[in-house]
């Protein structure tokens, strides 16, 4: 009997459990279910209820039902619910949960607000919707900031950003500053930088605070064609604000990068400006600019100190060109890539007439010259010139000697083609090109043959650095004095190298990467002609033989090369202040033996030919 009783009880339990499971499954089919901890429990979730709840609150508000507080803003009365306000507006949450008298009041007066703005804000609390217009955005932003409704404040800032204009961006910036909206201040500043020359012509410009003017003029992001525009803006503000001269005259002029102004403008305009002449610190700034130009000339100022004022702004820094070279296929390129500093990206410019690897490249007076190299079949002596104004390459006079692995330098106008090699010989030949006459002539040869040499003009000499003499890579360095027509050896590098890049920065010569006799190098050395000494600086992030380098905005860019296993399309930049290399935007084509130079033109002048952005060729 006992066994029969147990069997009957187990059967009932089994039937009951089965019914529960069936009901559970039916409920699951109707709603969202998740199992709880108990075997026979479940959690019922009805997301639709939230929509009903939200809709009911909105209807209560619109119909004035169950309201327990009225906001009085001027003559406007807004009936609403304390709980709803406290859920969305931190200001009211703090008020209603405090011991303040307003916590128990049914009529709360809010002073110094726009009634329509508060009403719009309350409607947003109930509906999550807000209509922004040119007329209501400022009072709404003010209310959202004071009442701490960050969602609405951010929406107002984004709306105002969309409606920036040269005539209103400075006023918007001042409004943002008064409400400590750093995000909107930054947006307005960036717009003012992007449209600087238009903003300067607007009425508000002379009314900006000296602190704000200081911030604007110091920015490297100013969209200008030349530093004259910054100087003229500074003088315009200073002449309109004589009350600020005692404290801000020299501070304002110090934000103008006077050393980057042409000498004739410095002497003919800046030096004759009365407010500059009458201020001792302004005269010191003018002397700094003069000394910079002397330092760059043959009358060098040996102890000149570089600063931010000697560093071009982004829009006047020029365009970095990467020209020719070759990749994994072995075929030389005729393509060129141009670097946009603002976008940190490269685009393809008009192609050369000839394919060229191990080509010499230089920019002089706003034009780019590509000389010599190898086209895949033979060595070249030809030269072509790219003019950003026409976006075309034009053939110019050829060198006397066909060669690849040459280096180019420009000193006082002429272009020097230095060293190089062909299949039989490493050359010590040096040719000089006169741009006006379009003619080449020979000058004194180097003391040592140098193929794959690096070169740069520094102060009043042309330097030839490293290379290969046909037997081994070289650590020796020599420099050319055009007045003596003579090459003289200087202190040798610490590392033998060929296929290295050479550039100058802050009065020093930098040699980057290259090959020793066995492998590519990552080491970087710096030469100071004042002390005739070399020292090592931070190494590249990867070895780069056949690397192209150039200096842009106070940094040295190393483009492409070969790391011993593959051709590279990566690019890295050296910051001398941090003594560090960092990767920047990569070129599309993996390439070594390309020529790299900075052209003093605008990125917008170069026609983007529109191909190659996804065409990364075989790097192996």
Curated annotation (Swiss-Prot):
A GO CC term attached to the entry: nucleoplasm
SUPFAM superfamilies: Galactose oxidase, central domain, POZ domain
InterPro entries: BACK, BTB-kelch_protein, BTB/POZ_dom, Gal_Oxase/kelch_b-propeller, Kelch-typ_b-propeller, Kelch_1, SKP1/BTB/POZ_sf
Biased composition range(s): Basic residues: 11-22
Entry-annotated residues carrying N-acetylalanine: 2
Pfam families, per database record: BACK (PF07707), BTB (PF00651), Kelch_1 (PF01344), Kelch_KLHDC2_KLHL20_DRC7 (PF24681)
Name of this protein: Kelch-like protein 8
Annotated transmembrane regions: none
Biological source species: Homo sapiens
